[in-house]
Amino acid sequence: MLAFLILVTVTLASAHHSGEHFEGDKVFRVHVEDENHISLLHELASTRQMDFWKPDSVTQVKPHSTVDFRVKAEDTVAVEDFLGQNGLRYEVLISNLRSMLEAQFDSRVRTTGHSYEKYNNWETIEAWTEQVASENPDLISRSAIGTTFLGNTIYLLKVGKPGSNKPAVFMDCGFHAREWISPAFCQWFVREAVRTYGREIHMTEFLDKLDFYVLPVVNIDGYIYTWTTNRMWRKTRSTRAGSSCTGTDLNRNFDAGWCSIGASNNPCSETYCGSAAESEKESKAVADFIRNHLSSIKAYLTIHSYSQMMLYPYSYDYKLPKNNVELNTLAKGAVKKLASLHGTTYTYGPGASTIYPASGGSDDWAYDQGIKYSFTFELRDKGRYGFVLPESQIQPTCEETMLAIKYVTSYVLEHLY
């Protein structure tokens, strides 16, 4: 039995490196002060293969900011030489990405089956959606809202006590494949809803008076790919005629200033906006569902990582939303509540000025559909681990995020429209 468990451990650990192994890859953080520094990074990106972690692309780099990016092992010396010769201040956040990837799995022996305190692959999450619905029929129902490019079923969980004409909160996770903490939170939220209903006054009130539409993984194809082939994959896995490059950035594919700023029309770019708004089956499924339930959905919450931010519209424009003061006040209260548990500090504000301009985002689109409480959460951390947050941080991350989500939900309930 012990030999079997060890085999399972080794198999799981190696599965994430069956394609890209990331041995010797480094993640750098560069301190950008001015336009000259930005030009130098553009020059570097044109000669070396750089995987931008924050922001998503070199085109989104702003003065007086920090830039995190991954470099393949064979390019690390050249990149460090370039940064040093040009006076760009930097530090190495991750000196060997493979070691960090293996360390994200805290338990040496991986249990089979679903766990809320570990990262689960799609097969496990899919089975969990069926099980959690069948075990809690008075609180949860599961429905299919579409299929992905590769034919995987997109499952949605409706969480709430049965009732007619109930207002709703829509929450999705897993837009970007490598942001594993995001689907972990959606699963945690469902667990907490079931566990605390009838025991905790706020959750009981929420589920009596509201429905939560929870989409645990939007980009299923990409998420699967991060488990089997390339842990750092971001986009979907769709293909298109005339290009050898794969995938679209789902969070550039919505009809909100589509492909106008902070997005690329190059299929090989990490921020490729797609051939048209809602060209991807996944974004179309989300948009269709929301359009069909627009009269009931009062808040839209989309969960990403990393950088510890709570963002609201707009990202495709520097204009402020009509209820900017209200959204700012709500975000301020939510991040204060979040920080009260573990002291985790979040920045908050409109997307374009707080993080970077980006068009085609789901939060902007939802807001423009009339959903006035629309927020993006960028979960832990601020770059020490980035996209490879250890499993030991799942519980504290989810616990504190729950406080913010519940704060927003309480406000929405008190300000129905």
Swiss-Prot record:
The active site is at E378. SMART domains: Zn_pept. GO terms for cellular component: cytoplasmic vesicle; extracellular space. GO terms for molecular function: metallocarboxypeptidase activity; zinc ion binding. Pfam families: Peptidase_M14, Propep_M14. Zn(2+) binds at H176, E179, H304. It comes from the Eukaryota. Binds 1 zinc ion per subunit. It is found in: Secreted; Zymogen granule lumen. Its cofactor is Zn(2+). Residues 118-412 form the Peptidase M14 domain. Residues 1-16 form the signal peptide. Chemical modification of Tyr-356 leads to loss of enzyme activity. Chemical modification of Glu-378 leads to loss of enzyme activity. This is Carboxypeptidase B. It comes from Bos taurus (Bovine). The lineage of its organism: Eukaryota, Metazoa, Chordata, Craniata, Vertebrata.
